Amino acid sequence: MGQKSNPNGLRLGIIRTWESKWYDVDKKVPFLVGEDFKIRTLIKNHYPKSTISQIEIKRLKKSNDEFIEIDLYTSKIGIIQGPENKNKNSLINKIEKLINKKIQINIFEVKAFNKIAILVAQNIAMQLQQRAFYKAVLKSAIQKALKSGIKGIKIIITGRLGGAEKARRNSISMGIVPLNTLRADIDYAFEEAHTTYGVLGVKVIINHGEVLPNKTIADTRQIFSSQYENKKNNNKRHFVNKKNFKTSTS
């Protein structure tokens, strides 16, 4: 029997880095992993779908206190921040109440959102839930992704497509998508669409090209983002250029 591995996990430590970046003694690791899961779940439930592409968690220690820094990558800055940062501050209060620790949230804007698998998958799932015809949705998503400059894309949808009595599988692929080439920068995401006919599964696989030796995904992808920060003593916004090269899998 053929065994399929997750393309994101298969490349960890080779061309991809972890989304949780911290170290601790072995006894605390299970507790901290569970805490990270709670934080990610709370953030995903706090905002609508097709909003956040990745959540990065970093743990820092200052004297005896632990400080958590969370980086949110999004294509919709206005929704994340809200009027006068109300949404952002509300999220900070919820997380601090949940884990009883101080946190800081940094927001990075993703410009080329059609290149990110999780955002493409969530957008397809939302349209399917709104009863859009699945073939038109797939065709539109692939055309937009290819125009953004990717090397290849594959989309797989399974379930009762179009309300059919029998579940089936439909896939569309364009370009090159080498899943077994470890140097290939493959972005993979899975999302569910809850319709009146049942649950549809949506898988999106995007190829950004090959990562050369001694290089990382940051050198391959051209998804730039800007950081929006409000200083305490200065009301002006500060923009910091940064490459967004990581994605999350749901």
From Swiss-Prot:
Record has rRNA-binding as a keyword: yes
Does the keyword rRNA-binding feature in the UniProt annotation?
Answer: yes
Species lineage: Bacteria, Bacillati, Mycoplasmatota, Mollicutes, Acholeplasmatales
Q: What GO molecular functions are on record for this protein?
A: mRNA binding; rRNA binding; structural constituent of ribosome
Species for this entry: Elm witches'-broom phytoplasma
Role according to the record: Binds the lower part of the 30S subunit head. Binds mRNA in the 70S ribosome, positioning it for translation.
Superkingdom of the source?
Bacteria
Per the record, GO CC terms?
Answer: cytosolic small ribosomal subunit
Q: What is this protein called?
A: Small ribosomal subunit protein uS3
Quaternary organization? Part of the 30S ribosomal subunit. Forms a tight complex with proteins S10 and S14.
Domain KH type-2, chain residue ranges per copy: 39-111
**Keyword line:** Ribonucleoprotein, Ribosomal protein, RNA-binding, rRNA-binding
PANTHER family given in the database record: 30S/40S RIBOSOMAL PROTEIN S3, SMALL RIBOSOMAL SUBUNIT PROTEIN US3C
State the disulfide connectivity.
none
GO biological process per UniProt: translation
